[in-house]
C-alpha cells in the first residue's frame, strides 16, 4: 500500500510517464487518483486537464461493476463507503478515449 505524505490518502494511480516511439511521455489526460482511508472516498484530480472521465469500479471477488459514474476531472470525490469490504479495480476512461486502471481495497 502506497501512502502519500499525510498517510491518509492511498495512491491508486499517478502520471508516471512511459515510452512511446522511444520518446518518454506522460499521457496528457491521466488523472491522479487517491483513496481516502478516513472518509472512504476516491479522489480524482485531473491535474488541470480539461478531460471528462467515465469511472467504473469493479469488485475483484464478483468481477461485477459495482459503481459507474462520470466526473468532470477538475477535482472530484466518489463515495465508496457503502461498498462491501473487498479489493476493487478502478477503470477510468477519459473523454480522449485513454484508459487507466488501478486497484484499491475498501475496508
What would you call each of these model-derived segments?
Residues 54-58:
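Beta-strand signatures of extracellular beta-sandwich domains
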Residues 2-37:
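Transition segment at domain starts
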Residues 47-52, 83-85:
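Short proline/glycine-enriched turn/loop motifs at strand-loop junctions of beta-rich domains
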Residues 72-94:
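Short, surface-exposed loop/turn motifs with a glycine/proline- and acidic-biased composition
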Amino acid at each position: 500500500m502506497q501512502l502519500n505524505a499525510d498517510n491518509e490518502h492511498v495512491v491508486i494511480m499517478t502520471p508516471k510517464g512511459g515510452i512511446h516511439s522511444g520518446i518518454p511521455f506522460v499521457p496528457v489526460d491521466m488523472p491522479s487518483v487517491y483513496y481516502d482511508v478516513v472518509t472512504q472516498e476516491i479522489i480524482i484530480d485531473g491535474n488541470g486537464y480539461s478531460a471528462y472521465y467515465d469511472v467504473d469500479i469493479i469488485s475483484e471477488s464478483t468481477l461485477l461493476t459495482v459503481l459507474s459514474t462520470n466526473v468532470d476531472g477538475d477535482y472530484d470525490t466518489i463515495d465508496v463507503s457503502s461498498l462491501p469490504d473487498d479489493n476493487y479495480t478502478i477503470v477510468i476512461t477519459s473523454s480522449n478515449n485513454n484508459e487507466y486502471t488501478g486497484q484499491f481495497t475498501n475496508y
